[in-house]
Amino acid sequence: MSEITLIEVDSAANPSVAVIWMHGLGADGSDFEPIVPELGLAESPAVRFIFPNAPYRPVTCNGGYVMRAWYDIISLEPDSRQIDETGLLESREIVRQLIQREEKRGIPSQRIFLAGFSQGGAVAYLSALTHPEPLAGVIALSTYIPEAKLITEDLSAANRHIPLFVAHGTDDDVVSIKLGRQAIALLGQCGLKPAWHSYDIPHSVCIDEVRDIGTWLNARISALEAAP
């Protein structure tokens, strides 16, 4: 695997499920580490949470300032983003390598979830919906789909019905809720049925949202355990 630093947290010993969770622009893998004990997974099989750090790169919309970013954002508009497609695809490759790493450690792809906040969620969307093997689900928080054609032209048959938890703040002034709803519309056009949640918050995560994520994740893990 190419060099990537990360944080790992196991909810209990001997995990049989994995969640690969991508942070937002300018943050790092520690950003969502505190969420693990708040998800209420004590009764579930053990889960390994992997929080990778995005590479450092200049971000055009921030004056070329170098920060952790999954891809360069060239311009910000209320209803769109101009991004560096190459960087987005490179980040998808990082996620694929992390999936392969978990498979080698004994967790099959169908027990691996992808999660992400803001641009990390965009990476989760693309990585999951174009992955050639079935995955367990996607948690997409305060995010968007910046390059629709990358998904529509390469939608994986293995993940055409993947479960999706999608959440957005109604007062988000960084990634507008309109962008989140555009993503929902695109997913619907692809035949997917995301579970949509909105909260009266800005570009952040709230405790009600965390509880809803935990409820959804517990239900999805229970479904995995019940599967033949």
Short names for language-model regions:
Residues 103, 108-159:
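Primarily recognizes the serine-hydrolase "nucleophile elbow" in alpha/beta-hydrolase
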Residues 178-228:
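C-terminal catalytic histidine-bearing segment of alpha/beta-hydrolase fold enzymes
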Residues 159-164, 190-192:
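Short, proline-enriched alpha-helix->beta-strand connector loops that line the catalytic pocket
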Residues 2-113:
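Serine-hydrolase catalytic machinery in alpha/beta-hydrolase-like enzymes
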Residues 41-44, 155-161:
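Short, conserved loop/helix-junction motifs that constitute active-site signature segments
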Residues 32-37, 152, 176-186:
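Short alpha-helix in the alpha/beta-hydrolase fold that links the catalytic acid
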Residues 52-53, 115, 139-142, 167, ...:
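Alpha/beta-hydrolase-fold catalytic nucleophile elbow
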Residues 165-168, 172:
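Short beta-strand/loop motif that positions the catalytic acidic residue
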